[in-house]
């Protein structure tokens, strides 16, 4: 059994595995692995711990800290900052690992823990498996999770200037010859981890900034706001006659943009702009199975290859490393610009689009002219218990028949969510009405067979 999903460990706070007891054990065994792999026995291993704005983050933070300290690991606490800030500061502090307490775009009652390696990238499968194996023995009661020698305990430190360090890092990704003084930008902070740093970065680069959903109270994170609810941003951009809108998700690693006409530009649109309109045209782009066929066609027309990876920024990163490319992402707004940051970073991705606007003197709507997404319909089917739809012959036959029906005009993708008990039914088709009808028919079939 693996406790890790596609993006760390996630669930409902108070229910296994997101409980203080489990998190304490997780901190301890992860600390043990770091101690065992420590190349310098004269120096204790250290980790950086950051979080988003969920109320439960306080409890999880304390449990993790206790676990790591018990294992003999020093802890640098940085408080609420975006996930990519933890990745950056892990490298900056020469820490052995980074830990993020967040459930990303999920509601406040969920939470999770994900890890970064010392280089600021996602933890390797080998390291994750080593943690998982030790964790299993502790959870099952076959191993202890206390430190016998009090002299070997770790310490914890609060890093007071973490926010400023990350702001400077973000600003450093923006070309020095441009500024944002001619732009009015609305930023929707999702009442999440980017509520403070997002607006500050834009202001310090000269933009006139209107911040919305930037008053977190512990339970309003992602609540009808942020990258999963761009409608409030669309309205605000039009009301304020802004040049552009930026929506972050709860942990600040996803971005959705809105142009001056109130039209949403998703991750595919952002990749198109960065690949084709930047001063240095991309050699290739890594997307995912969810990347719209319209992106593939637009990139091909520009002489740029698109490689599809499995869903998840971890797999996009692996694809980029395999090809030696620097640009990749997902329609949901995970955008990786590896020449600027080692992980998906909403603020940095947004700055790269704003840099293209400054460089070309074009509006966001002008930059997406000629870029057309195929109509896409995504229906989520919630299950009591996760199962694989491809284990049901009746469903496999239905999927194959539907794919044959739209061959040459679109595509079908059916997959399990990596973070929730959901089956995602996605249809892309050149006709919007047919697309919607087919997606709901297939979702109803999944419900009927698997419920």
Curated annotation (Swiss-Prot):
It catalyses: alpha-D-glucosamine 1-phosphate = D-glucosamine 6-phosphate. The keyword Aminoacyl-tRNA synthetase does not apply. SUPFAM superfamilies: Phosphoglucomutase, C-terminal domain, Phosphoglucomutase, first 3 domains. Its EC number is 5.4.2.10. InterPro entries: A-D-PHexomutase_a/b/a-I, A-D-PHexomutase_a/b/a-I/II/III, A-D-PHexomutase_a/b/a-II, A-D-PHexomutase_a/b/a-III, A-D-PHexomutase_C, A-D-PHexomutase_C_sf, A-D-PHexomutase_CS, Alpha-D-phosphohexomutase_SF. The keyword Magnesium applies. PROSITE patterns: PGM_PMM (PS00710). The modification Phosphoserine is found at residue 104. The active site is at 104 (phosphoserine intermediate). It is an enzyme of class 5 (isomerase). Activated by phosphorylation. Keywords: Isomerase, Magnesium, Metal-binding, Phosphoprotein. Binds 1 Mg(2+) ion per subunit. GO terms for biological process: carbohydrate metabolic process; peptidoglycan biosynthetic process; UDP-N-acetylglucosamine biosynthetic process. Its cofactor is Mg(2+). Catalyzes the conversion of glucosamine-6-phosphate to glucosamine-1-phosphate. HAMAP family: GlmM_B (MF_01554_B). Belongs to the phosphohexose mutase family. This is Phosphoglucosamine mutase. It comes from Psychrobacter sp. (strain PRwf-1). The gene is glmM.
């Amino acid at each position: 059994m693996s406790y890790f999903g596609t993006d760390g460990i996630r669930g409902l706070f108070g229910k296994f595995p997101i409980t203080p007891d489990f998190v304490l054990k997780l901190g301890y065994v992860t600390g043990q692995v770091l101690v065992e792999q420590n190349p310098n026995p004269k120096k204790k291993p250290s980790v950086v711990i950051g979080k988003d704005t969920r109320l439960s983050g306080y409890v999880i933070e304390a449990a993790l800290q206790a676990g790591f300290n018990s294992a003999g690991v020093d802890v640098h606490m940085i408080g609420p900052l975006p996930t990519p800030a933890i990745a950056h500061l892990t490298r900056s502090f020469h820490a052995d690992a980074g830990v993020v307490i967040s459930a990303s775009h999920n509601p406040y009652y969920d939470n999770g823990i994900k890890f970064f390696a010392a280089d600021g990238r996602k933890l390797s499968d080998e390291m994750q498996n080593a943690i998982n194996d030790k964790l299993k023995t502790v959870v099952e009661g076959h191993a202890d999770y206390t430190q016998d020698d009090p002299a070997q305990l770790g310490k914890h430190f609060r890093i007071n200037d973490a926010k400023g360090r990350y702001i400077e890092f973000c600003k450093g990704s923006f070309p020095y010859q441009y500024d944002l003084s001619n732009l009015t930008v609305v930023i929707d902070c999702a009442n999440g981890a980017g509520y403070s740093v997002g607006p500050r970065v834009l202001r310090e680069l000269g933009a006139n900034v209107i911040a919305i959903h930037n008053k977190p109270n512990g339970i309003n994170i992602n609540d009808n706001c942020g990258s999963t609810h761009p409608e409030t941003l669309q309205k605000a951009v039009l009301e304020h006659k802004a040049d552009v809108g930026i929506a972050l998700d709860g942990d600040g690693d996803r971005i959705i943009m809105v142009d001056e006409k109130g039209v949403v530009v998703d991750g595919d649109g952002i990749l198109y702009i960065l690949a084709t309109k930047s001063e240095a045209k991309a050699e290739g782009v890594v997307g995912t199975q969810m990347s719209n066929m319209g992106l593939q066609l637009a990139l091909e027309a520009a002489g740029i290859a698109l490689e599809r990876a499995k869903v998840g920024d971890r797999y996009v990163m692996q694809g980029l490393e395999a090809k030696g490319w620097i640009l990749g992402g997902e329609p949901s707004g995970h955008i990786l610009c590896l020449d600027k940051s080692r992980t998906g970073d909403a603020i940095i991705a947004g700055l790269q689009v704003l840099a293209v606007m400054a460089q070309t003197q074009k509006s966001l709507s002008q930059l997406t002219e000629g870029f057309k997404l195929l109509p896409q319909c995504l229906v989520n089917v919630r299950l009591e218990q996760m199962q694989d739809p491809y284990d049901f012959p009746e469903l496999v036959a239905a999927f194959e028949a539907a794919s044959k029906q739209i061959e040459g005009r679109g595509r079908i993708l059916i997959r399990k969510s990596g973070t929730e008990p959901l089956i995602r039914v996605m249809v892309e088709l050149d006709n919007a009405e047919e697309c919607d009808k087919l997606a709901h028919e297939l979702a109803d079939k999944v419900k009927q067979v698997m419920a």
